[in-house]
Amino acid sequence: MPTTQQSPQDEQEKLLDEAIQAVKVQSFQMKRCLDKNKLMDALKHASNMLGELRTSMLSPKSYYELYMAISDELHYLEVYLTDEFAKGRKVADLYELVQYAGNIIPRLYLLITVGVVYVKSFPQSRKDILKDLVEMCRGVQHPLRGLFLRNYLLQCTRNILPDEGEPTDEETTGDISDSMDFVLLNFAEMNKLWVRMQHQGHSRDREKRERERQELRILVGTNLVRLSQLEGVNVERYKQIVLTGILEQVVNCRDALAQEYLMECIIQVFPDEFHLQTLNPFLRACAELHQNVNVKNIIIALIDRLALFAHREDGPGIPAEIKLFDIFSQQVATVIQSRQDMPSEDVVSLQVSLINLAMKCYPDRVDYVDKVLETTVEIFNKLNLEHIATSSAVSKELTRLLKIPVDTYNNILTVLKLKHFHPLFEYFDYESRKSMSCYVLSNVLDYNTEIVSQDQVDSIMNLVSTLIQDQPDQPVEDPDPEDFADEQSLVGRFIHLLRSDDPDQQYLILNTARKHFGAGGNQRIRFTLPPLVFAAYQLAFRYKENSQMDDKWEKKCQKIFSFAHQTISALIKAELAELPLRLFLQGALAAGEIGFENHETVAYEFMSQAFSLYEDEISDSKAQLAAITLIIGTFERMKCFSEENHEPLRTQCALAASKLLKKPDQGRAVSTCAHLFWSGRNTDKNGEELHGGKRVMECLKKALKIANQCMDPSLQVQLFIEILNRYIYFYEKENDAVTIQVLNQLIQKIREDLPNLESSEETEQINKHFHNTLEHLRSRRESPESEGPIYEGLIL
């Protein structure tokens, strides 16, 4: 039978299993011999056990498991030897003896184990033995075996390295300098072995080797952790000895993987205070790293860490003598210069980190933030970038960069102080400019930032011009209507934040805003001009409030209404009708209420403009009814007209109502007109209501006549009920022309017609309306109000 091929994983498991079994057998024998005090035999079994670490067949992961199993067993040997030496056994002989082990791997592991026990028993030998051990380990140059051997050396000597604060005879026991030299040498040798791994084996296994190297990196990094744990390593020693030694090794190894990992390791394991004192050498080293190293990530990690340190409430902050921002700014520029092929998005990422640093460490220094933006503009100019596509990585990073000042200051006026914010904004393509403009305006609205001067209005409008005017690079096809409406509504809401405490300044602000919005095209102005008109009306009311302090207030009001008139006229030119009609009516009301010199003429002009729009521009019957109802309602509220002006306007309303196309619309509009002759007011009667009962009756009779002409029975009855309600209203207002007899006749007419209607949901509604009307009359008849009319003789 042919044997089945094993997978590499199964092969590894089998090899590891066999090695572990051998370790168990040899360690069992070693322990038996130790229990019988047969030390030489025990060392022979230990040597056999360690012989398993000579293999080249295991993967790093499997080798690590084997190494851990053997380390545990060696610990047993170390404890035994420590006890023996405490009882007076000679260590020196043993230290000499294990050097005769046949193979170098077992020999060095045993030497380290015995050497550590020797140092614990005779501290005066520490300096020589440590030096001896770290040098002897050079005997193993196979990368995997050498790395684990040196890791064993580092772990075993962890508690015996000389450090600060312990009584020592420096000649023999060594001091902190010896510890630093020991770990730095071990680190350098381990790094060389680790780097050399990539050159072993066939080139087709390169990816696999890189993965294995990634798995082993922590062994090299442990040296740096060990250095950071030495209490004797203060800022001065770190600067002069430790960092210099590490950086020399990192830069000289010319291996991208090692450089990137070790630089990040330095940032992580040493304290922030050390980094602050060694920024320049560290960042200079960054500029010298291999071209394939992602320097951006290293620098960003350091910046972010120091920014957090500066921001800590319980921390000491950044010392005044350390110009943190300047150092990073200069060194980042050097790094970018040294890497011509650095991707644009990485360059911008570095600026993002710099701006974060400026914001967190120097919140008051707007100039630092602007310096970062200026540098970015210069870089883009060199790269000849323009209209950066929304989908690109550069655009995403640039968006991050520009959002930081917006989000941190939460005040657009501070952002406007950044001279290079707008120039950088212009590098975006149309889509990105639009979305960033929305982002900026949303921030203004969220934080209610008031814009108080013309210059500020100009600056913001220019910044977000993509939302306000057509752009040369905008797409040919029309935007999505919903999105467009959302964007323009944002702009419309923003207008309400254009407000100065000084009314004259406010007028200039509105004028400036109109210049920008006026160029927005027909699609935009329907959203942007109405709020501007309302802001103008509000300003006129402010002048009225301040009339005691400003003797020219009336002329200024006239100017404002002229401004509003021009602005509304722009909407008419854009072929809009209903919107300008409403704005004219609102203006007429405002002018009448404020009562400045000439206000009647202004109000009359605004009313007649509304009429012209109604007659010339509105053709849809539904829209016509809505418009004439609005005109009548507005006019009824006004009390600034003399009879000379009031009479033609109310007559015009009645005429327009009777000319509507559809009979039901005519009936409703004419009955609404009745109110003008009752509660309308003019100056001739000192603002009192007209109470023209006869004219009211004429309107209501005309409405009934029109209702009679309707062909649809349901609609006819519905109109009768509506007109009945009008009659009741005027009867209760004590209009003598409306009598109980009139009410009885109309109720009787409705009662006769209702049963003839076809059964439907609509008929049900009509019945309900009529029933509610009768209920109202019944309750009034049964409990008459003391001042109200008496419903005597009403037939229900």
Curated annotation (Swiss-Prot):
Q: Where in the cell is it found?
A: Cytoplasm; Membrane; Endosome; Early endosome
Where in this protein does the record put region Disordered?
A: 776-796
Q: Which residues carry this modification: Phosphotyrosine?
A: Y791
Phosphoserine (modified residue): where? Answer: S7, S783
Q: What residue spans carry the region label Interaction with SNX3?
A: 25-44, 205-215
Metal-binding as UniProt keyword: no
Protein's membrane topology? Peripheral membrane protein
The record's GO molecular-function terms, alphabetically, read:
D1 dopamine receptor binding
Among SUPFAM superfamilies, the record links this protein to: ARM repeat
Tissues in which the protein is found: Detected in striatum (at protein level). Ubiquitous. Highly expressed in fat tissue, testis, brain, kidney, thymus, liver and pancreas, and at lower levels in heart, intestine and skeletal muscle. Detected in oocytes, pre-implantation embryos and at 6.5-12.5 dpc.
Q: Which UniProt key words apply to this protein? A: Cytoplasm, Endosome, Membrane, Phosphoprotein, Protein transport, Transport
- Which one GO biological process term can you cite for this protein? regulation of dendritic spine maintenance
Region described as Interaction with IGF2R cytoplasmic domain:
500-693
Could you tell me which residues belong to the region Interaction with SLC11A2?
438-796
Query: How is this protein annotated for GO cellular component?
Result: cytoplasm; cytosol; dopaminergic synapse; early endosome; endosome; endosome membrane; glutamatergic synapse; late endosome
What this protein is reported to do is described as:
Acts as a component of the retromer cargo-selective complex (CSC). The CSC is believed to be the core functional component of retromer or respective retromer complex variants acting to prevent missorting of selected transmembrane cargo proteins into the lysosomal degradation pathway. The recruitment of the CSC to the endosomal membrane involves RAB7A and SNX3.
Record note on quaternary structure: Component of the heterotrimeric retromer cargo-selective complex (CSC), also described as vacuolar protein sorting subcomplex (VPS) formed by VPS26 (VPS26A or VPS26B), VPS29 and VPS35. The CSC has a highly elongated structure with VPS26 and VPS29 binding independently at opposite distal ends of VPS35 as central platform. The CSC is believed to associate with variable sorting nexins to form functionally distinct retromer complex variants.
Give the family from UniProt: Belongs to the VPS35 family.
What name does the UniProt record give this protein?
Answer: Vacuolar protein sorting-associated protein 35
Name the gene for this chain. Answer: Vps35
